[in-house]
Regions:
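Phosphate/pyrophosphate-binding loops and the adjoining catalytic core of nucleotide-dependent enzymes
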Residues: 2-136
């Protein structure tokens, strides 16, 4: 069993973040949620999109979506409009963060986790997974 050193991960995360290189993902997110009830927060290599109508639960389901350099934008175009229509909180790895995550020095436990979705309950989780299974 691998044990992830959280302090090392946080330090690596903050060292690699460059806001100038996250503009593609960020502008796409802004177009999708511009008039929705969301709050965007940048934290390290992530852009957190918090639904103001459905606050994050203290515990519950998480859905991770992986991506490569070849398909990340296509995945964004499919996934983001759907989860925004459900008013679900999620986070996306920024442009620079994506490159960092795919590097050989990044902790393997975190590699490729491009989008994390936080469903409100089991029913919503199943619905999202069903959509993703058909669409991706």
């Amino acid at each position: 069993m691998n044990i992830l050193n959280i302090n090392l991960f946080k330090k690596y995360d903050l060292m690699q973040y460059n806001p100038k290189e996250s503009k593609i993902v960020e502008s796409m997110l802004m177009k999708q949620i511009s008039f929705k009830n969301y709050q965007l927060k940048k934290k390290g290599i992530f852009i957190n999109c918090i639904s103001l109508n459905n606050p994050l639960q203290y515990q519950g389901w998480k859905i991770h979506i992986s991506a490569s350099n070849n398909n990340y934008f296509d995945i964004l175009l499919i996934v983001i409009p759907y989860i925004v229509s459900l008013n679900v909180s999620f986070k996306v790895v920024s442009e620079n963060g994506r490159n960092t995550m795919l590097s050989k020095n990044f902790p393997r436990e975190q590699t490729g986790k491009f989008i994390t979705i936080y469903p409100q309950n089991t029913v919503q989780c199943r619905a999202i997974i069903s959509f993703l299974n058909k669409s991706l």
